[in-house]
Amino acid sequence: MGRFKRHHEGDSDSSSSASDSLSRGRRSLGHKRSSHIKNRQYYILEKKIRKLMFAMKALLEETKHSTKDDVNLVIPGSTWSHIEGVYEMLKSRHDRQNEPVIEEPSSHPKNQKNQENNEPTSEEFEEGEYPPPLPPLRSEKLKEQVFMHISRAYEIYPNQSNPNELLDIHNERLEFLGDSFFNLFTTRIIFSKFPQMDEGSLSKLRAKFVGNESADKFARLYGFDKTLVLSYSAEKDQLRKSQKVIADTFEAYLGALILDGQEETAFQWVSRLLQPKIANITVQRPIDKLAKSKLFHKYSTLGHIEYRWVDGAGGSAEGYVIACIFNGKEVARAWGANQKDAGSRAAMQALEVLAKDYSKFAR
């Protein structure tokens, strides 16, 4: 009986210990949850204060005030210093937390009118409006990921030893996808716009349109260079001024639109962005390879025809300029990537000039 009683008392002690452990676990979980909520609140407040500081700096520039003392003179009580102190305190608390909070990208002022609407269709882009409205992302996850630079991802997850775990956090995979679709969309657009342009010319034109220079300019139209989230060290290294980094952000946004199920909207958006560039393209007529023969058969009995090199040193960039001479007078001159093409184009122009005013060049 005594043995049974001691055994029963042991079970009671064990049960009590388990209960205490469970209770401590719940308190710990509650503490962690509370800590996370508090961390989130610190983060949101920190973000709001940071925006306020940016606004105050902008106001300083507009009013030509350049020091914190100027602000404190305008607004009593060392306002700037107090705000800056609160910001640093909140940032310090946030950085000490183990569980990171991913920053949410702010909306560019030009895009605020789109936030309450559904994504625009091609019909919603107003004629002549440039830049076209930024198609909003529907996925909250993509909204965060698209502006998350890899440097910031490693900064908020410093103990992550497996880089693959961060692939869904930063925007490099989105940039890879967007780069492919930027090429595809541009190919579709110029293939349709320039039906008489050969493959080589189309390739050169596409290369001009899809390079980092174009993507960087498009990104800055929407303030992506300001919205991009970088690490502290990346900011110090001036990555925000890097053309490649900002261009990648544009491509990441394009990739995010694709994953968001908005491929047609993305195509219309790129089409509108490229519109001014396409409008400035002057397409030459296809080369008439029989132009020299036509000119010879029509005018050789009426005078002497010759072709002279007048400019250019060759190569696809510089090319050649060839003049068509009739009875010692220059009738036309034309450029070509090689001497044969330049001569053919000069003959094409000469046929038109002589047809209109032959008497000017007659013997």
UniProtKB/Swiss-Prot annotation:
User: Does the UniProt entry include the keyword Acyltransferase?
Assistant: no
The record's annotation in SUPFAM superfamilies points to: dsRNA-binding domain-like, RNase III domain-like
Q: Where is the RNase III domain?
A: 139-262
Judged by the first EC level, this protein's enzyme class is hydrolase
**Xref: SMART domains:** DSRM (SM00358), RIBOc (SM00535)
Q: What is its EC number?
A: 3.1.26.3
- Give the UniProt keywords, A-Z: Endonuclease, Hydrolase, Magnesium, Meiosis, Metal-binding, Nuclease, Phosphoprotein, RNA-binding
Q: What Pfam families does the record point to?
A: dsrm (PF00035), Ribonuclease_3 (PF00636)
| Compositionally biased region (Basic residues) | 24-35
PANTHER family, alphabetically?
RIBONUCLEASE 3, RIBONUCLEASE III
What role is this protein assigned? Digests double-stranded RNA. Converts long double-stranded RNAs into short oligonucleotides, leaving 5'-phosphates on their cleavage products. Probably inhibits mating and meiosis by degrading a specific mRNA required for sexual development.
Q: Which protein is depicted?
A: Double-strand-specific pac1 ribonuclease
Q: What is the lineage of its organism?
A: Eukaryota, Fungi, Dikarya, Ascomycota, Taphrinomycotina
Encoding gene (name): pac1
